[in-house]
């Protein structure tokens, strides 16, 4: 939704986890006024600044039920809702819908909403129509915006021709509260029983890297004709210790997973993805968050980021996308619709188009 604000951008935030707390601290630095914070259960009624480890800001954490959301939106009239909670669209919709219906643009950290048309074809169309009907934009950003899509598309611009693109990403999951769903520390037998009792939900059934690569294919104007997915559960080859979680993991137990995807295009370019999500093994010198992009073509290119600083770059990517979301036309947008992300050094309101 195009904007011509006279004052600062006003935003509400959903989620007080790692990303949410970082945004509470960072939004004021970019001239964004925080007018509301929502959480499912934790910290309700507390000062959100204190929850984030900052000075008190006077913005209390509210419950995220529909009535509470609409009440805060009606009272504070924000320009943007930043949602840093879950990934899957069915769980996100109860948060997105009241925002959209109240005329509030939405920026989400969801890896599935980043390019949802292959996973939620009907839900994506419905969300697009709802956003257009209310004149607002819905968009998802985060680490994938830069490292999984934009860097790849930029590298292709330095080539005469391309045969394939191989993207390998290692993400350590220690600092994120969802790590237990991976079955960390379980034996193979225990993990198989765990899966029977806890079927993989939609939020963890799809590789974020594969979804982002589909977005890259679209951004490059290519046509995907086939996709092949694989999953390997990773087990420790020796006793290991994770310092951040103070967690001992015995040899032969689950430490993470490796999701692989191959996407073939009608234009003859093949995309290969390997997304490794695991607990860091510090004794092996593994800090995690490695990102590598290999382009086979003319010329061959190999770009390695040894540590992409996942927590920080997720938040920074979202902050820098705020003006892009507010400047975009109504509807559900993906990275294929917007310009490349870049650092916004001035107050974010200065980047809004009239």
Q: For the regions a protein language model found, what residue spans apply to each?
A:
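Rossmann-fold NAD(P)-binding glycine/threonine-rich loop
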Residues: 111-136
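Rossmann-fold NAD(P) dinucleotide-binding segment
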Residues: 69-80, 89-111
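NAD(P)+-binding Rossmann beta1-loop-alpha1 motif at the extreme N-terminus of oxidoreductases
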Residues: 2-33
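C-terminal helical cap and adjacent loop that interface with cofactors, partners, or active-site loops
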Residues: 280-354
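NAD(P)-binding Rossmann-fold cofactor-contacting core
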Residues: 30-54
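Active-site-lining helix/loop region of Rossmann-like oxidoreductase modules
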Residues: 10, 14, 18, 22, ...
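Short, ordered loop/turn segments at secondary-structure junctions
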Residues: 40-42, 86, 104, 110-114, ...
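Short acidic-hydrophobic, aromatic-tinged amphipathic segments that line or gate anion-handling sites
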Residues: 58-68
């Amino acid at each position: 939704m195009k904007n011509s604000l006279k004052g600062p951008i006003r935003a509400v935030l959903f989620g007080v986890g790692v990303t949410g707390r970082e945004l509470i601290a960072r939004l004021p630095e970019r001239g964004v006024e925080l007018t509301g914070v929502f959480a499912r259960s934790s910290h309700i009624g507390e000062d959100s600044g204190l929850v984030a480890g900052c000075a008190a800001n006077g913005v209390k954490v509210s419950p995220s039920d529909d009535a509470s959301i609409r009440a805060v939106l009606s009272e504070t009239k924000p320009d943007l809702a930043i949602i840093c909670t879950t990934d899957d669209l069915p769980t996100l919709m109860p948060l997105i819908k009241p925002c959209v219906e109240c005329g509030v643009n939405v920026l989400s950290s969801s890896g599935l909403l980043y390019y949802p048309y292959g996973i939620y074809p009907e839900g994506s169309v419905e969300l697009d129509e709802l956003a257009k009907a209310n004149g607002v934009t819905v968009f998802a950003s985060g680490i994938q915006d830069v490292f999984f899509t934009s860097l790849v598309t930029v590298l292709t611009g330095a080539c005469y021709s391309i045969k394939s693109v191989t993207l390998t990403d290692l993400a350590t999951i220690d600092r994120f509260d969802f790590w237990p769903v991976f079955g960390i520390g379980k034996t193979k037998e225990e993990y198989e029983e765990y899966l029977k009792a806890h079927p993989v939900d939609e939020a963890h059934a799809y590789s974020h890297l594969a979804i982002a690569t589909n977005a890259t294919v679209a951004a490059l104007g290519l046509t995907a004709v086939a996709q092949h997915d694989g999953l390997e559960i990773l087990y420790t080859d020796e006793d290991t210790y994770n310092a951040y979680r103070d967690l001992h993991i015995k040899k032969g137990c689950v430490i993470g997973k490796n999701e692989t995807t191959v996407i073939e295009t009608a234009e003859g370019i093949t995309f290969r993805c390997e997304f490794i999500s695991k607990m860091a093994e510090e004794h092996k010198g593994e800090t995690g968050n490695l990102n590598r992009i290999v382009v086979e073509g003319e010329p061959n290119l190999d770009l390695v980021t040894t540590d992409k600083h996942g927590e920080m770059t997720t938040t920074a990517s979202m902050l820098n996308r705020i003006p892009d979301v507010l400047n975009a036309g109504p509807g559900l947008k993906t990275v294929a619709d917007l310009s490349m992300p870049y650092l916004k050094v001035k107050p974010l309101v200065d980047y809004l188009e009239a």
